[in-house]
Amino acid sequence: MVKRNLKGRGDKLSANAPLDNQLEAGKVAKQRDELREKQKRKREDSQTDEFVPDSLSSKILNEARKQLLEEALERQETESATSSVPKRQRGAWLGADASGDKSDDDDDDNEEEDDNGFEDQVVELDPRDEADLARFLKKDAIQMSTLYDIIQAKIEAKQNDAELALSQVDPNEFNMRDMDPEVVEMYEQIGQYMSKYRSGKVPKAFKIIPKMINWEQILFLTKPETWTAAAMYQATRLFASNMNPKMCQRFYTLVLLPRLRDDIDEFKKLNYHLYQALCKAIYKPAAFFKGLILPLLESGTCTLREAVIFSSVLTKVPIPIFHSAAAMLRIAEMEYTGANSVFLRALIDKKYALPYRAVDGVVNHFIRLKTDERDMPVLWHQCLLALCQRYKNDLNAEQKAAIYELIRFHGHYLISPEIRRELESKETEDGHVITSVVVEGRKTDSMEF
C-alpha cells in the first residue's frame, strides 16, 4: 500500500472515496476552508476598528493642556524671581476644546500649531547679576584637566628629573649607589660569562651598562681584569659607540689601557682581539688621546715596544686634523723620552695641514734640547728629519737657523746631512706648497681636544 503524503500541517485524514468520486473531485478546484476565511476576516476587522474614541481623546488633550499651563506658570515665577529683565514666555497652543463632532483634520491642525507655538528664547543677563554670581564662585577652583594633560605632565616631570640627575653627574667621580643583591648577583654571573666569552652575542644586561649613572660600579662587578680578549673587544665597541667622550676616556684609562699593557708585557706582543679593540677605541679621538696615549706617555714607563704598537694604529686609521695637532702639541710639551719621538713621527708622517702653532710647538720641542748633554737616540734624529721633510716650507729663517745650530751639537753622521740638505734645498715657485692652514672661524691658538 502506498503511503499517503499530507498536503500541509493540520490536514484532516479522510477515508478513501470510491474511484469515480475521486475522479470527479479532481476535475473541480478545491474549495477553501471556510474556518480560515472567517478568522482572517476577523483579524482584518479588529485592525481596522482600533481607534481612540472622541471622549478619550478630549480627556487626553485637556490633561495635556493643564500640564503645559502649570509648567508655564512655574517657569514664569522662577524667571521673575531670578531676573528683573522680562522674558518672553513660551506659548502653549492646543487649540479649542476638542468635541466629539470634530474630525481628525482638526487634530492635525492643532498639532501644527503646537509645533509653531514654541519660539527661541533669548536670555540677557545684567552685568550686576553676573558680578553678584561671581562673588559666590570659588576663586581657587581646580581646573579640570584631561587625560592627555596628566600624562604629559608626568612625562615632563620624569624628563626633568633625569636631566637634573645627569647634570649632577661628574664623569671624573666614581658614583657609588646602593644596589639590589639580585642585581649584584646577576652582574657577577655576567662577569663569569665574559671570562669565558669567545664569540656570539653579549648579554643584554651588559649592553645597558653605558646608559647607567653608576656604570663604573656595575662594570667592576663583572671583574674586567678576568675578561677574555674577545670580550674586551666587544666591550670596547659597545662603550666607544654609546658613551660620550668623557665617560669613554674613563673606560679607556681604567679598563682598556691596563689590559693592553699587561698583555704586551706578558706575551711581548698584543693579542689580535685587543689590537682590534685598540683600533675601535680611536672612534672617539679625544678620548683615545686623553685616555690612552697621553696617560701612557705621562706615566714615564712606556716602553718602545708599547710605543710602536700603539703608534701603528695612528698610521692605519684617519684622525681629525685638530685632534692630531692638539696631541702633537701636548706630546711636544712633555719631558722627552724615546716613546715621544715614536708618536711624534707617526703623527708627522700623516702629512696633515697643521696649524702654525702645532708646527712651532714641535720645532721648539727639538730646539730646547740643544743644551741637553745626553746623546740623542736615532729615533730623535729620524723624527727631526721627518719634520724637516714634511713642513720645511712652514719654517721661518730663525727656526731654520736654530735647527742648523741644533744639529751641530747633536749630530748624526747619516741623518744630520739629510736634515741640512732638506733645509738648504731651493724651492721653485711651482713646487712650493704651503701646508699649514688657518681655519676660518676657529682659533688656532687654543690647541685643545
Swiss-Prot record:
* Residues in coiled coil: none
Molecular function in Gene Ontology = snoRNA binding
What Gene Ontology terms describe where this protein resides (cellular component)? cytoplasm; nucleolus; preribosome, small subunit precursor
Q: Where is the composition biased (Basic and acidic residues)?
A: 30-46
* A GO BP entry: rRNA processing
Q: Where is the composition biased (Acidic residues)?
A: 103-124
Q: Report TM segments.
A: none
- Residue ranges, annotated region (Disordered): 1-58, 71-125
Similarity comment text for this entry: Belongs to the bystin family.
Which PANTHER family does the protein's record reference? BYSTIN
The protein's name in its UniProt record: Uncharacterized protein byn-1
Q: Which organism is it from?
A: Caenorhabditis elegans
Organism lineage reads as: Eukaryota, Metazoa, Ecdysozoa, Nematoda, Chromadorea
